[in-house]
Amino acid sequence: QQGHDVTIATRGQHDNPFDERVHHTILDRTNSSELRKAFEGTVYDIVYDNICYTPKEAMELCAILNDHTTRLIFTSTMSVYEADGVAKREEDFNAMNYIYDLIPSQQHSYAEGKRQAEAVFEDYANFPVVAVRFPIVMGEDDYTSRLSYYVEHIEQGEAIEFVNLDAEMSFILADEAAEFLYWAGFANIEGPYNATANGKISMRKLIQTIEQVVDKEAIIVEGTSPYSIPASWYMTNAKATEAGFTFTQLTDWLKPLIEKIAK
């Protein structure tokens, strides 16, 4: 839409949703030889990596992109922070000098994989890297169905599980996440940036909102579920706001989203 020359790289398990408007390369992100071949003879102004989960993958990407790109936008996560009830700022996890293991004795957790990937980019990338730390992403087409889990269970009179209803979380809408990634590609920024809608919500308030929408009372038991966390887990977006991005208000879109899911 903006007139850019765009190439997407996927495993080819789904059709290219953009038809001939973008180039489509089929590859396995975890296969370094396929990845290297895809960049042969090509230089990209901006590369977006949404599926780097380990320090090894980050290291391989640096080895390839050091001669083939001028800028990388790496999709990281709020999971690099501990859920300890304190609002998280970017400096609460510093990837510089963080220890990473390229040949781990056991598979990295999602959070640890992202921490170590950020650390590798700090050490080995000779191009600017923006690490975008997203909270849980919400949307109508969320393949994880995390919000849908609560809506459907309450609608059907089935129990939902929590360990702390007063725990608060931050979220971002899928469309807003996409807008932020685009902005990050062209903004004069570098390093880690939290990207989250303004505001936070307790699990109690979230469930009450769903109850209002579906007109049913939730059955709540103690246990684990997608949003069941022991303590509040949310971020501040002040750094990105100061850099020029305008975030939405969580309260403006959460209830309308629940209404769409409940239909």
Task: Label each residue range with its predicted role.
Residues 60-113, 130:
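Conserved Rossmann-fold NAD(P)-dependent oxidoreductase catalytic core, especially the SDR/UDP-sugar
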Residues 180-233:
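Mid/C-terminal beta-alpha module of Rossmann-like enzyme folds, strongest
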Residues 13-69, 82:
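NAD(P)H-binding glycine-rich loop region in Rossmannoid oxidoreductase-like domains
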Residues 4, 251-263:
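Amphipathic terminal alpha-helices
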Residues 151-161, 166-195:
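Alpha-helical substrate-binding/gating segment
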Residues 174, 208, 226-247, 252:
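Conserved C-terminal active-site "lid" loop/helix of NAD(P)H-dependent oxidoreductases
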Residues 118-140:
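Conserved beta-loop-beta element that borders a ligand/cofactor-binding pocket
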Residues 107, 135-144, 164-174:
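Glycine-rich "substrate-gating" loop/helix at the edge of Rossmann-like oxidoreductase active sites
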